[in-house]
Swiss-Prot record:
GO molecular function term, any single one: GTPase activator activity
Keywords for the protein's UniProt record, in alphabetical order: Cytoplasm, ER-Golgi transport, Golgi apparatus, GTPase activation, Membrane, Metal-binding, Phosphoprotein, Protein transport, Transport, Zinc, Zinc-finger
ZnF C4-type: positions: 25-48
Organism of derivation: Mus musculus
CDD domains documented for this protein: ArfGap_ArfGap3
Name of the featured protein: ADP-ribosylation factor GTPase-activating protein 3
Gene3D superfamilies noted in UniProt: Arf GTPase activating protein
Gene name linked to the record: Arfgap3
Comp. bias regions, Low complexity: 348-361
Length: 523
């Protein structure tokens, strides 16, 4: 037995997927499944096929219905005898309604269904061999191809048939041209007897008058491609009395006029009532004016000041433009502006520096007193020494805050500019070019220390500003000592000297004490 061809495989799966239950996934219900489980004969989506593949081929053998072309006849028979509906009913009959894939296909019901599908597929393969369809899955009847219809020909035929039907229909209410009724001929008499003329004097039956001009026909169902049944849209006119229509129109106009009059009456009544109220208010206000005996300017002022006792409805209110008076201020006093800077900037600078120096001197005086009080218990001489230092004039502290702290080379030398221009002309009259140092005499006042430093650094290949101005470079944190941290002020120098003297005296005192102890207890 050979393998089925690709056309046979496509034909079989096309037939199987046409079943409504096979158009969705057996496990999750996704549409258009393209994979199949041969072991159960069900259709699956690509996600559920991965879950079945993880179970193993001994539980579920997966193939693609579109990509795989090496199907065998036994595998195709498994799909034909199976199906999503058969598998679903079998699992429900055996009480397997779980959604878990592992639990579902490892259950007893799944094992029984696998054996059933295998048995039915083997029997179908032996019975039908290589036949494309089984008895239970017969080939679908081939329907003839739809015949192409000519749109214009069908439309024309429908119109012609409709016109013929309209002409064949008898008129419902027909009458003679003159409204006479004709009676059938009576053949009971002889052949010479003519038609009866008894109905000539009888008036014809008048047709019932219809209020509408055009008679509407009931809607009829349309057939074909929009063709209308009956005539080509023509509508029949009936006998209508135009005088009756005119009477109805006049009646409608009269009704509208009456409605307009009825609407206008309440408006007029409201206007009249409002006028009555206005006249009543005017009468009340007039009586109050007579009682208060107000007239002329007094009445206007009373109403403006709110003394109308609730009757101020004449439109008079407080006005900004009326009775406005301009009040002028007599002998205005101007505020004297405060001077932001009372003194010259240089004076303020020196005054601020003097204040700071006073505060700093006060700060430096306090530690001295504290130190003197602490050391007074050790030596009376030290106490007198600190008292002597604390009573000194705080001028050194004031001088320390000035410009004397800066190096002498960086300070601007104090010089006196040349008094008159005649001296400068006499001094520099024959010189082609001069500098500011020459003009102000700065070069002549160069300090001796600066010259000495320049001579000392003349042999150096490179110098720095710290070397030129004899400034100490910044030391590392490990090289700092108490002398570098404490400010270099005269008071601090005296403080250091006092500490050294006290320390020396303390050491002498300690040596004396130790010597006396050794002499007393050592021997």
């Amino acid at each position: 037995m050979g393998d089925p061809s690709k056309q046979d495989i496509l034909a079989i799966f096309k037939r199987l997927r046409s079943v409504p239950t096979n158009k969705v996934c057996f496990d999750c219900g996704a549409k258009n499944p393209s994979w199949a489980s041969i072991s159960y004969g069900v259709f699956l989506c690509i996600d559920c096929s991965g879950s079945h593949r993880s179970l193993g081929v001994h539980l579920s053998f997966i193939r693609s219905t579109e990509l795989d072309s090496n199907w065998s006849w036994f595998q195709l028979r498994c799909m034909q005898v199976g199906g999503n509906s058969n598998a679903s009913s079998f699992f429900h009959q055996h009480g397997c309604a779980t959604k878990d894939t592992n639990a579902k296909y490892n259950s007893r019901a799944a094992q029984l269904y696998r054996e059933k599908i295998k048995t039915l597929a083997t029997q179908a393969t032996r019975r039908h061999g290589t036949d494309l369809w089984l008895d239970s899955c017969a080939a679908p009847p081939v329907s003839p191809p739809p015949k192409e219809e000519d749109f214009f020909a069908s439309h024309a035929s429908l119109e012609v048939s409709g016109a013929m039907q309209a002409s064949a229909q008898p008129e419902s209410a027909s009458s003679t041209p003159w409204g006479l009724e004709t009676t059938p001929e009576k053949h009971e008499g002889g052949p010479g007897q003519g038609p009866s003329v008894e109905g000539l004097n009888t008036p014809g039956k008048a047709a019932p008058e219809v209020s509408s001009i055009i008679k509407k026909k009931p809607n009829q169902a349309k057939k074909g491609l929009g063709a209308k049944k009956g005539s080509l849209g023509a509508q029949k006119l009936t006998n209508t009395s135009f005088t009756e229509i005119e009477k109805q129109a006049q009646a409608v106009d009269k009704r509208k006029e009456q409605e307009d009059l009825a609407r206008g009456a309440p408006k007029e009544e409201s206007i009249v009532s409002s006028l009555r109220l206005a006249y009543k208010d005017l009468e009340i206000s007039r009586k109050k004016d007579e009682r208060l005996n107000l007239s002329g300017q007094k009445k206007v002022e009373a109403e403006r000041l709110g003394m109308g006792f609730g009757s101020c409805r004449s439109g008079i209110s407080h006005s900004v433009t009326s009775d406005m008076q301009t009040i002028e201020q007599e002998s205005p006093t101007l505020a004297k502006p405060r001077r932001k800077y009372q003194e010259d900037p240089e004076d303020s600078y020196f005054s601020s520096s003097s204040k700071w120096s006073e505060q700093s001197s006060r700060y430096f005086d306090d530690p001295m007193e504290l130190r003197s009080s602490s050391f007074s218990s050790w030596d009376d001489g030290a106490d007198s020494y600190w008292k002597k230092d604390s009573s000194r004039d705080p001028e050194p502290a004031m001088r320390s805050t000035g410009s004397s702290d800066r190096p002498s080379a960086r300070r601007k030398p104090e010089y006196e500019p040349i008094g008159s221009t005649d001296e400068a002309q006499k001094k520099f009259g024959n010189v082609k070019a001069i500098s500011s140092d020459m003009y102000f005499g700065i070069q002549a006042q160069t300090d001796f220390e600066t010259r000495a430093r320049l001579e000392r650094l003349s042999t150096s290949s490179s110098i720095s500003s710290a070397d030129l101005f004899d400034e100490q470079r910044k030391q590392t944190a490990g090289n700092y000592n108490l002398s570098n941290v404490l400010p270099n002020a005269p008071d601090m120098a005296q403080f250091k000297q006092g500490v050294r003297s006290v320390a020396g005296k303390l050491s002498v005192f300690a040596n004396g004490v130790m010597t006396s102890i050794q002499d007393r207890y050592g021997s």
